[in-house]
Amino acid sequence: CDWSSDVCSSDLFALMRGPVFTSFLLADEINRAPAKTQSALLQAMQERAVTIDRETHALSPNFTVFATQNPIEYEGTYPLPEAQKDRFLLKIAMGSPDRDSELILAQRMLGSDAPERVLESGVVEAVISESDLDELRGTLEEIVVREEVLGYIVDVVQGTRKTDSILVGAGPRATQAFVLATRALAALSGRDFVTPDDVKALAAPILGHRLILRPEHEIEGVTVEEVIQRLLEEIAVPR
């Protein structure tokens, strides 16, 4: 075969399942991926399925994407489509490590076997089975969200569409994200009900990557976090 598609044998093919066929996918530096790759990931995130040679393959019911992103001012990055950003439940700014954490990193570099120990420290071990995860997710259905709190969530999301400094506000997916995430936060806090404080605590992580500021406000140095904080201060909180 001379590697031309029209003369190569085409009767011997097998699906080679790549890294996307998993329950938890870590996509490192997602904004360095070209548009075609981002489009394929978007389908996986939206449909929990991928299409290869016109055949659709289902992914794990627990398929979840964790992604890191480089600051946009770095060279070699691509803007993420708004539709793709909207598929992410939360966006969390990691920041730099504190002094104690960075000191531990420095200590690991001491000794002749430092490279090996650093690699060993990065080994990931399973901490929960998929069946246990399914059970935990089921418990979230028992977390109560009062009608007043649901109304507060809707008011916050719709408020982003009415704020002068915001060009594009959050869509209905943000409302869904609030319901999911606040229930999880309540469970982690040992409560069986969601409070308005849960909504406030998750407002920036849920809304931050879904909002687009007007250019004139960006030039003035206004940040999305500041706009969200002002919005929370303006909206009446249910008792």
What positions do the PLM features span?
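Short, small-residue-biased leader/transition segments that mark boundaries at the very start
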Residues: 1-9
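Residue-level signature of catalytic and energy-coupling elements of molecular machines
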Residues: 41, 88, 153, 182, ...
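Conserved AAA+ ATPase small/helical "lid" subdomain
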Residues: 118-175
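Walker B catalytic acidic pair
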Residues: 28-29, 40
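Canonical AAA+ ATPase core
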Residues: 6, 33-37, 45-128, 133-143, ...
